[in-house]
Amino acid sequence: MLKMESTQQMAVSIINSSFEAAVVAATSALENMGIEYDYQDIYSRVKNKFDFVMDDSGVKNNPIGKAITIDQALNNKFGSAIRNRNWLADTSRPAKLDEDVNKLRMMLSSKGIDQKMRVLNACFSVKRIPGKSSSIIKCTKLMRDKLERGEVEVDDSFVDEKMEVDTIDWKSRYEQLEQRFESLKSRVNEKYNNWVLKARKMNENMHSLQNVIPQQQAHIAELQVYNNKLERDLQNKIGSLTSSIEWYLRSMELDPEIKADIEQQINSIDAINPLHAFDDLESVIRNLISDYDKLFLMFKGLIQRCNYQYSFGCE
């Protein structure tokens, strides 16, 4: 039987392996370009960026949440699995949606567009006024819904700070950036290609993990069908056993009271719950052995009173 959190641990292991692959890719790229580097510094930089992108985009919590649903189903807690059954009936639909959403979130996070900027951009839009330098800020439907739900608060700690005069020579700065652009272009393209390969590998891992869900659900359904069949077979076997014993008991030349007592014990066997039925059978067998023991002791005492001797076995 699987452990309580085996699927969740597998998902965490895949994410950790993806991080290690990112570190190896970064160091390999630097070595190929002949750039000296400090491994601990590269490791720290990649870890900070990787943790931020995975957490801010929600990619980390997505497979872990699905893994928790699988673990709960494997431990006979089907509430979460049933709620997601209809949505996950078509595996291509959630796989495609998750792939597209995760890809967009990671691209935005890697470019410095964090969750705060994405939420603000989704809540507001700006409309320019023709012929004027001012503009109109419009609230989107998402902002209206948040207002209705009471999810908007007023920040009373706003402080009007003094604006400093910008004295930067933008023309000189632009010329410097233009000179560096060509030298950085090839390096940026190489980093981007490496990132695409890592993202594609991660998407493949996520897709494989999502395919586990319907497989596990089918396996659980098969186990339930087998368990129901086994329980019915045991119930039929127990019913057949009690009927056979009752028929055999009626054919014996025993006292009617003894027959009635044994028949009452047999009828007390629970034919619905197999576990209880085995306990009842054990009790009946123990009672029969106890009655036989008492009969033997009575017969032994009678022989001794008649001054006879007895022995076991054949001489």
From Swiss-Prot:
Question: A Gene Ontology CC term for this entry?
Answer: host cell cytoplasm
| Native organism | Rotavirus A (strain RVA/SA11-Both/G3P5B[2]) (RV-A)
Q: What is the lineage of its organism?
A: Viruses, Riboviria, Orthornavirae, Duplornaviricota, Resentoviricetes
**What is the name attached to this protein's record?**
Non-structural protein 3
- Please give one Gene Ontology molecular function term for this protein: RNA binding
* Function summary: Plays an important role in stimulating the translation of viral mRNAs. These mRNAs are capped but not polyadenylated, instead terminating in a conserved sequence 'GACC' at the 3' that is recognized by NSP3, which competes with host PABPC1 for EIF4G1 binding. The interaction between NSP3 and host EIF4G1 stabilizes the EIF4E-EIF4G1 interaction, thereby facilitating the initiation of capped mRNA translation.
CDD domains found in the cross-reference section? NSP3_rotavirus
Protein family membership: Belongs to the rotavirus NSP3 family.
Give the UniProt record's GO annotations in the biological process aspect. regulation of translation
Entry-linked SUPFAM superfamilies:
NSP3 homodimer, Rotavirus nonstructural proteins
Annotated region RNA-binding: where?
1-149
Q: Where is this region: Interaction with host EIF4G1?
A: 208-315
Annotated coiled-coil segments of the chain: 166-237
Keywords (A to Z) from UniProt = Coiled coil, Host cytoplasm, Host-virus interaction, RNA-binding, Translation regulation
Return the annotated region ranges for Dimerization: 150-206
Annotated stretches, region: Interaction with host ZC3H7B: 170-234
Q: What is annotated about its quaternary structure and interactions?
A: Homodimer. Interacts (via the coiled-coil region) with host ZC3H7B (via LD motif). Interacts with host EIF4G1.
Among Pfam families, the record links this protein to: Rota_NSP3
Q: Where in the cell is it found?
A: Host cytoplasm
